[in-house]
A protein has these predicted regions:
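Aromatic- and acidic-residue-enriched carbohydrate-binding clefts of CAZyme catalytic domains
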Residues: 102, 146-186
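Mature, folded catalytic cores of secreted/periplasmic enzymes
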Residues: 60, 127-128, 182
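Generic, well-ordered alpha-helical scaffold segments in large soluble proteins
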Residues: 13, 81, 126-129, 133, ...
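Catalytic alpha/beta active-site cores
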Residues: 107, 127-128, 139-141, 159, ...
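Long, contiguous hydrophobic alpha-helical segments, chiefly transmembrane helices and signal peptides
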Residues: 98, 106-111, 142, 147, ...
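The substrate-binding groove and active-site-proximal loops of carbohydrate-active enzymes
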Residues: 64-65, 107-120, 174-186
Length: 186
């Protein structure tokens, strides 16, 4: 199931960036992909759970990971090889092979929305960029005395009161405020 989702994700990215629509389909065991195909697969011989091997040949691209996560990180490498939003009629990738695995098991970034609210579209873009750079952990700081950003139906006052502030300090260590209501929640 995850391998299929990875294939659909890659096909959608290629469609958005080049305008080409790719078909995704499962191959029967032992069968060979047609020329020009991008093949995703699992290979338990790859040494790291998040490792992958990406091979580009004149007639096909093969991407194997030890797990679906490894395939996902290989897709990110492939994404970085395709110019974003080219709408070109073709994309030429140099032939070669990349064998990659993470040096560190924990690779993450933090987003503090407790102190400063970010719109949902920004958060989605941020997560997409984390994936593009092979980060595997997103630490989302949702609560703080400056803002409560997660709705809990049983406690509505947390967001009615805690998600908003009536003003924001201007600069540092000043008594000046902008008197603009600010905040939000997810």
């Amino acid at each position: 199931e995850l391998l299929k989702r990875n294939a659909e994700f890659l096909a959608e990215y290629i469609s958005q960036s080049t305008g080409h629509t790719l078909q995704t389909e499962a191959l029967a065991p032992g069968s060979e992909a047609p020329k020009g195909a991008i093949t995703l697969g699992l290979d338990p011989a790859i040494g790291n759970r998040e490792g992958y091997v990406l091979t580009v040949k004149a007639d096909r691209v093969t991407l194997n990971g030890q797990t679906e996560n490894g395939v996902f990180y290989g897709i990110q490498t492939l994404r970085k090889s395709i110019p974003a939003e080219t709408k070109a009629t073709s994309v030429l990738l140099p032939a070669g092979s990349i064998q990659d695995e993470p040096r560190f098991s924990y690779r993450g970034m933090h987003l503090d929305v407790g102190r400063h609210f970010f719109p949902i579209e920004f958060v989605k873009k941020y997560i997409d960029l984390l994936a593009l750079h092979n980060m595997n952990t997103f630490h989302w700081h949702l609560t703080e005395d400056q803002g409560w950003r997660i709705e809990i139906k049983k406690y509505p006052k947390l967001t009615e009161i805690g998600a908003w502030r009536d003003r924001t300090v201007i600069g540092r260590n000043t008594e000046e405020y902008d008197n603009t209501r600010y905040g939000g929640f997810y």
